UniProtKB/Swiss-Prot annotation:
Residues 77-221 form the Flavodoxin-like domain. GO terms for molecular function: flavin adenine dinucleotide binding; FMN binding; NADP binding; NADPH-hemoprotein reductase activity. This is NADPH--cytochrome P450 reductase. It comes from Musca domestica (House fly). This enzyme is required for electron transfer from NADP to cytochrome P450 in microsomes. It can also provide electron transfer to heme oxygenase and cytochrome B5. The lineage of its organism: Eukaryota, Metazoa, Ecdysozoa, Arthropoda, Hexapoda. Its cofactor is FAD; FMN. Keywords: Endoplasmic reticulum, FAD, Flavoprotein, FMN, Membrane, NADP, Oxidoreductase, Transmembrane, Transmembrane helix. It is found in: Endoplasmic reticulum membrane. NADP(+) binds at R295, T529, S589, R590, K595, I596, Y597, V598, T599, D632. FAD binds at R451, Y452, Y453, S454, T469, A470, V471, Y475, G485, V486, A487, T488, W670.
């Protein structure tokens, strides 16, 4: 009975008894409940069919017990990974796969999708082992997917007696907090009573992290065998993790065409937008900043209106690029493949949470264009598998040798692969007898990762726009080939003058922040595109001044090669100087015979530097090259603090560390 009909009956029969009224109320409530229940039943299929099972490595909340999975499948090895770019996840997969050789059936697990308190139950599984492959990210932080685990292990006081573990860290020595996360987790697990089975391994991405991992791994397994009393090991057998399923009859609307997780997410956009659900932002400006010199630097403006994404000056924007179509076609021809074949790669381990290496079903063309790093330098395990597809024994031995841990093999890999910047396409072009099936290539190559850029605008001025400042990466290799940066080449082609163009993006929050009090003075060091976040800072300080706020000194040290060629945003910066918002210090390294860099200017301005960071307790920022510039600037600061602040070197170093803890010293650097 409808609510409208109930109202009619009541008006016509005003003398109903109490019982009649009570019955009517019951009927009304019942009808409402039935109506709402029916609607929920009708809506349920819409939700379940429009949101596809995620195809990245995740476990649903009802399947987050890794202990149950280990016990149910007779496994004793679990390898957790904390990964931002995919390398730690790749290493974890390789360790779990190799466990079979040593009679340890393993599984890979994402700590973000697991109940990590179950580590306490590992002791209930005989001869069990937990391995942690953990990257350090940003300013000594855990990766996004390891954050909760890191906080839990830091703040918790659990008893992990009976847990056997090992840790391998991924870091970069050019950064101050080298492998901080892995070092801490290794130490903390021992403090909580766990047993270290093998020594901490540390990989350096600035050198050869692949070599570091292999060297550690090849000593790790013998120690594991000794610890658990495992005698001997099986032969090394190359096994496929995924099986091929060609699907010519799949309906076109069920095929992934570049979506990160949810099918049709690019056509049917809905917030919140993040790494698994990027927003398609329109490119509204794409202009050249360099006025000469042969290099290219782009100023790009993206429209994020309607996305509900918010950003602050200093945040990063991540962009999902696509691979060069020419390279994709080349790879298809080298593998003698029909790139438009629809297929799925299905994990042979039915208990794994990672059902596919990337969204499936899809086509080879889409996989190679949107999902796989075809321009990356292949790691040694890929060469080992490629060797099996060589018809020429010399080629097979050559690849196997480069994949080995012998000094000769390592040297060949360094020279022929790394120093020559050979990617998978180049390898197959140069080794004519190597013709692997395209599906195995898709299994071996790592996932194409988003590229991160410092946002070069302030949301105070541009709440619905995000600005990017990026140099086009392009260089000639020793083999005579021209390698191009995946993301910057992709952006270079996005010209809004030829029609609407969009790119998939999301915002990543940062700790790189202006002082909360505008009157605090700041010093910024940003040569080249290191200027990017400071452009946003300066815009914001100007905005505050225009609004009547008191704003402290805003000092920028900027450097480039030549004033008339690559002095980016020159007119803007000079305008800020004219109106009193900015003090600008410039170094043009090639405009005179003797090169001048920003580090020279900072040394010359020792009194000013000390006044701002020592006497006025101002903030100091660095953005740019981590390997040389950032290290040099930090060393100069130590000297300035020693001489002007009357400190010894140790005290000066501690002063900078104190500034870091107070968020007065911040670095946004890359190598």
């Amino acid at each position: 009975m409808s609510a409208e009909h109930v109202e009619e009956v009541v008006s016509e029969e005003p003398f109903l008894g109490t019982l009649d009224i009570a019955l009517l109320v019951v009927l009304l409530v019942g009808a409402t409940w039935y109506f709402m229940r029916s609607r929920k039943k009708e809506e349920a299929p819409i939700r379940s069919y429009s949101i596809q099972p995620t195809t990245v490595s995740t476990v649903s909340t009802t399947e987050n017990s890794f202990i149950k999975k280990l016990k149910a499948s007779g496994r004793s090895l679990v390898v957790f990974y904390g990964s931002q770019t995919g390398t730690a996840e790749e290493f974890a997969g390789r360790l779990a796969k190799e466990g079979l050789r040593y009679r340890m059936k393993g599984m890979v697990a994402d700590p973000e999708e697991c109940d990590m308190e179950e580590l306490l139950q590992m002791k209930d599984i005989p001869n069990s082992l937990a391995v942690f492959c953990l990257a350090t990210y940003g300013e000594g932080d855990p990766t996004d997917n390891a954050m909760e685990f890191y906080e839990w292990i830091t703040n918790g006081e659990v008893d992990l007696t009976g847990l056997n573990y090992a840790v391998f860290g991924l870091g970069n020595k050019t950064y101050e907090h080298y492998n901080k996360v892995a070092i801490y987790v290794d130490k903390r697990l021992e403090e909580l009573g766990a047993t270290r089975v093998f020594e901490l391994g540390l990989g350096d991405d600035d050198a050869n992290i692949e070599d570091d991992f292999i060297t550690w791994k090849d000593r790790f397994w013998p120690s594991v065998c000794d610890f658990f009393g495992i005698e001997g090991s099986g032969e090394e057998v190359l096994m496929r993790q995924f099986r091929l399923l060609e699907q010519p009859d799949v309906q076109p609307d069920r095929i992934y065409t570049g979506e990160i997780a949810r099918l049709h997410s690019m056509q049917n956009q809905r917030p919140p937008f993040d790494a698994k659900n990027p927003f398609l932002a329109s490119v509204i400006v794409n202009r050249e900043l360099h006025k000469g010199g042969g290099r290219s630097c782009m100023h790009i403006e993206l429209d994020i209106d309607g996305s509900k994404m918010r950003y602050d000056a200093g945040d990063h924007i991540a962009m999902y690029p696509i691979n060069d179509k020419i390279l994709v076609e080349k790879l298809g021809k080298l593998c003698d493949a029909n790139l438009d074949t629809v297929f799925s790669l299905i994990n042979t381990d039915t208990d794994s949470s990672k059902k596919h290496p990337f969204p499936c079903p899809t086509t080879y063309r889409t996989a190679l264009t949107h999902y796989l790093e075809i321009t990356a330098i292949p790691r040694t395990h890929i060469l080992k598998e490629l060797a099996e597809y060589c018809s020429d024994e010399k080629d097979k031995e050559f690849l196997r040798n480069m994949a080995s841990i012998t000094p000769e093999g390592k040297e060949k890999y360094q020279n022929w692969i790394q120093n020559s910047s050979r990617n998978i396409v180049h390898i197959l072009e140069d080794i004519k007898s190597c013709r692997p099936p395209i599906d195995h290539i898709c299994e071996l190559l790592p996932r194409l990762q988003p590229r991160y850029y410092s946002i070069s605008s302030s949301s105070k001025l541009y709440p619905t726009n995000v600005h990017i400042t990026a140099v086009l990466v392009q260089y000639e290799t020793p083999t005579g080939r021209v390698n191009k940066g995946v993301a910057t080449s992709y952006m270079k082609e996005k010209n809004p003058s030829v029609g609407e163009v969009k790119v998939p993006v999301f915002i990543r929050k940062s700790q790189f922040r202006l002082p909360t009090k505008s009157e605090i003075p700041i010093i910024m060091v940003g040569p080249g595109t290191g200027l990017a976040p400071f452009r946003g800072f300066i815009q914001e300080r100007q905005f505050l001044r225009d609004g009547g706020k008191v704003v402290g000194d805003t000092i920028l040290y900027f450097g480039c090669r030549k004033k008339d060629e690559d002095f980016i945003y020159r007119e803007e910066l000079e305008q800020y100087v004219q109106n009193g918002t900015l003090t600008l210090k410039t170094a043009f390294s090639r405009d005179q015979q003797e090169k001048i860099y920003v580090t020279h200017l900072i040394e010359q301005d020792a009194d000013l530097i000390w006044k701002v960071i020592g006497e006025q307790k101002g903030h100091f920022y660095i953005c740019g090259d981590a390997k040389n510039m950032a290290v040099d600037v930090r060393n100069i600061l130590v000297k300035i603090l020693s001489t002007k602040g009357n400190m010894n070197e140790s005290d000066a170093v501690q002063y900078i560390k104190k500034m870091e803890a107070q968020k007065r010293y911040s670095a946004d650097v890359w190598s």
